C-alpha cells in the first residue's frame, strides 16, 4: 500500500526481525518516534530516537522543519542521514493504521518532508498500527519506564500528553516548583497545596492562573487569581500586563512568587513566558527554550502560543521604538560613529539546570546575551 507521498508501510513482524538484526549487528536502520516527549518517555521501541516537533517548532517552521529542528542533539545521526549511511528509516506514531490515514500536518508528515529534503538515499517506512500495536504484539522489544494506563482522555490542551510515574504520581506533580528567576517559580496546583514546599523555597505569594484551583493558605501567603480556562477560546493575553505587574510587585518587596495552574504546563507557563519576553526583551523562542530547560513538560496550547507570538511583536516593537528615540539611536540614524551603548535589553540567562533543582543547587554562571532586535 502506497501513500500519496510514496510512504510505504512496515508491519510489526518485519520491524521485529529488523530490530533483532540491528541489535546483533549494529545500526544501519534508524527508528524515529514521532510521538510527544512524555509518551516516548513512558515507553518506546528499543533504540528509537524521539523527534522534537513541539508547538513552537511547528509555528516557527510553518510546515518546513529541518533535521536540526527535529533532531537538535543528534549531530552524528544527522550526519549519517545526509551521508546516506542508513539503509532504512522507520517512523512511528501512536496508532496510525496506514500511511493514507496520516494528516498533512501530522508530526510524521512533517518529519517525512524533512527527511526527504535533507537526507541521502534511504528507504523510509511507516510502522503500521504505530507503537500501540507493536507494543501489544512485541512487548519484549519495547522499553517502558512509566505507565500511561491510568490517564483519562484529555479534556483540554492542559491535560494532553501527561505521563505518570511507576508509583502513580503525575509527571507534572513530581519534584517541586522550578526556579525561573530568583523571585519567580513555576509549578502545579499540587505544589501550591504543599506548604512545606512553599516555605522551603521562601515563597511569599502565589499567582493562580485558573478558575477552579483553590487558594489553600490565604492567611499565610499573598494570592492573586487570573481566572483563565485552558482552551482555544481563552484570551490569556489580556491578563499579561496585570500578571507582570503582580510579579514585579512581589519582586520589589523582596518576595518570591509561585505561578501555577492545574498542571503547570500551559496557562502558568504562558504567563512565565510573557514575563520573560516583556522584562528581558527576548523572543518567544528564546524564552520557551529557557523555561523548558527548567520544566521540560511545558506545552502552552496552540492559541496561547499564537497570543505569545503577537505579544512578542508588541514587545520587540517597543524595544525598537525605545532605541530609536534614544540619543544613541538618533546618532545611528544620522550615520555618525558611536560607541556601543550599554543596552537596557542585555540580560543574563542562567545556565541550564535540572528540572527539579532547588535554589541552593542552581549555579548561576552568567553570560550576557544581547537580545534587542535590529530595528
Curated annotation (Swiss-Prot):
Catalytic-site annotation from UniProt: 261 (phosphocysteine intermediate)
EC number: 3.1.3.16, 3.1.3.48
SUPFAM superfamilies reported in the protein's UniProt record: (Phosphotyrosine protein) phosphatases II (SSF52799), Rhodanese/Cell cycle control phosphatase (SSF52821)
Compartments (UniProt record): Nucleus
Keywords: Hydrolase, Nucleus, Protein phosphatase
Catalytic activity of the protein: O-phospho-L-tyrosyl-[protein] + H2O = L-tyrosyl-[protein] + phosphate; O-phospho-L-seryl-[protein] + H2O = L-seryl-[protein] + phosphate; O-phospho-L-threonyl-[protein] + H2O = L-threonyl-[protein] + phosphate
One CC-aspect GO term: cytoplasm
Nucleus among keywords: yes
Family (UniProt): Belongs to the protein-tyrosine phosphatase family. Non-receptor class dual specificity subfamily.
This protein's name: Dual specificity protein phosphatase 4
Domain Rhodanese per the UniProt entry, residue ranges: 25-143
Species this protein is from: Gallus gallus
Class of enzymatic activity (EC top level): hydrolase
Job description of the protein: Regulates mitogenic signal transduction by dephosphorylating both Thr and Tyr residues on MAP kinases ERK1 and ERK2.
Domain annotation Tyrosine-protein phosphatase: ranges: 176-317
Amino acid at each position: 500500500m502506497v501513500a500519496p507521498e510514496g510512504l510505504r508501510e512496515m508491519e510489526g513482524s518485519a520491524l521485529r526481525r529488523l530490530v533483532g538484526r540491528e541489535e546483533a549487528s549494529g545500526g544501519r536502520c534508524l527508528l524515529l518516534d514521532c510521538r510527544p516527549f512524555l509518551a516516548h518517555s513512558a515507553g518506546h521501541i528499543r533504540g528509537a530516537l524521539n523527534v522534537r516537533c513541539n508547538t513552537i517548532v511547528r509555528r516557527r517552521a510553518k510546515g518546513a522543519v529541518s533535521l536540526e529542528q527535529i533532531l537538535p542533539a543528534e549531530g552524528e545521526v544527522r550526519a549519517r542521514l545526509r551521508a546516506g549511511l542508513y539503509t532504512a528509516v522507520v517512523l512511528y506514531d501512536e496508532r496510525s493504521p496506514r500511511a493514507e490515514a496520516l494528516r498533512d500536518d501530522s508530526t510524521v508528515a512533517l518529519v517525512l518532508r524533512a527527511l526527504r529534503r535533507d537526507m541521502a538515499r534511504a528507504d523510509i517506512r511507516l510502522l503500521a498500527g504505530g507503537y500501540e500495536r507493536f507494543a501489544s504484539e512485541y512487548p519484549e522489544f519495547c522499553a517502558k519506564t512509566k505507565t500511561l494506563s491510568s490517564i483519562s482522555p484529555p479534556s483540554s490542551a492542559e491535560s494532553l500528553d501527561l505521563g505518570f510515574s511507576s508509583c502513580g504520581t503525575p509527571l507534572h506533580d513530581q519534584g517541586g516548583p522550578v526556579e525561573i528567576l530568583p523571585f519567580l517559580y513555576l509549578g502545579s496546583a499540587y505544589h501550591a497545596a504543599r506548604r512545606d514546599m512553599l516555605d522551603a523555597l521562601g515563597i511569599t505569594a502565589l499567582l493562580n492562573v485558573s478558575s477552579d484551583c483553590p487558594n489553600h493558605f490565604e492567611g499565610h501567603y499573598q494570592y492573586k487569581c487570573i481566572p483563565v480556562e485552558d482552551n482555544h477560546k481563552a484570551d490569556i493575553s489580556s491578563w499579561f500586563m496585570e500578571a507582570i505587574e503582580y510579579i514585579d510587585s512581589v519582586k520589589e518587596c523582596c518576595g518570591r512568587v509561585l505561578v501555577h495552574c492545574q498542571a503547570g504546563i500551559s496557562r502558568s507557563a504562558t504567563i512565565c513566558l510573557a514575563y520573560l519576553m516583556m522584562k528581558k526583551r527576548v523572543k518567544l523562542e528564546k524564552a520557551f527554550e529557557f523555561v523548558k530547560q527548567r520544566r521540560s513538560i511545558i506545552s502552552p496550547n496552540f492559541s496561547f502560543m499564537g497570543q505569545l507570538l503577537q505579544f512578542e511583536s508588541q514587545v520587540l516593537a517597543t524595544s525598537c521604538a525605545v532605541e530609536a528615540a534614544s540619543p544613541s539611536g538618533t546618532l545611528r540614524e544620522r550615520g555618525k560613529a558611536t560607541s556601543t551603548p550599554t543596552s537596557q535589553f542585555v540580560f543574563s540567562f542562567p545556565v541550564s539546570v535540572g528540572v527539579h533543582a532547588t535554589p541552593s543547587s542552581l549555579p548561576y554562571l552568567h553570560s550576557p546575551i544581547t537580545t534587542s532586535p535590529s530595528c
